[in-house]
């Protein structure tokens, strides 16, 4: 049962001022309270911020678990939004006969904290996932019991649950690093189906073709041979669960990073054939990092900074 306590929380003037920038958009946050039984509540906050410069949007849901039967504060952070692919086609300025495709080999998603009183206790997804569609559930039972189910349809009855669901066709999700203070995922190009069969994401000739015209775009395969993560971008859906020692500090800061690593494929015609060159991670860590401050007592969430501005 959701109580009718929907409030509009506006960022303080002193917070907005340092972030004022034509390349950044911050939306208002919507707040809700959900009764999950036995006197426990989930206090929900949402923050949206967009970097127009890097074409990245973070939509972050902060669910505070208020449970008298759990001896710690708990926070479930669901990371959503959009990371544009920024795939481009162009001629090299000094050598216009060489055509270039810049495309995302990897999407980056991470959360970390430096707070000694905060620990990462769960996260989704876990391990390596190579399925095109990813669906998992995090569940909570009164008393501090967090569990994860393999899919949205997984068995188990929870007082509260949160799901993730996203498409990663031709890509694979890997946990690159994880410890008590954070987790980092990489959603990496894996393999692609081409007219010549299955091709590795590391293949030198991937996406290049005999030109169908003089433009840079004509040197690379058409859109119907490219997956959504290259044509348009990636919609992340990841979860972290964090615990906080009660009575040890009212506020904590978290840094959430979204971004991409870009590969470059070069193509040009020699006298006898199409020549192709490839540079892996040509543009690495094209990321946006947003620092959020959460208040464990008032359950407020504020945006402290964004890098780059």
From Swiss-Prot:
InterPro entries: Bi-component_toxin_staph, Leukocidin/Hemolysin_toxin, Leukocidin/porin_MspA_sf. Its main location: secreted. Keywords: Cytolysis, Hemolysis, Secreted, Signal, Toxin, Virulence. GO terms for biological process: cytolysis in another organism. GO terms for cellular component: extracellular region. Residues 1-29 form the signal peptide. SUPFAM superfamilies: Leukocidin-like. GO terms for molecular function: toxin activity. It holds the Pfam family Leukocidin. Toxicity requires sequential binding and synergistic association of a class S and a class F component which form heterooligomeric complexes. HlgA (class S) associates with HlgB (class F) thus forming an AB toxin in strains producing both gamma-hemolysins and leukocidins. HlgA and LukF-PV can also form a complex. Belongs to the aerolysin family. Toxin that seems to act by forming pores in the membrane of the cell. Has a hemolytic and a leucotoxic activity. NCBIfam families: hlyII. This is Gamma-hemolysin component A. It comes from Staphylococcus aureus (strain MRSA252).
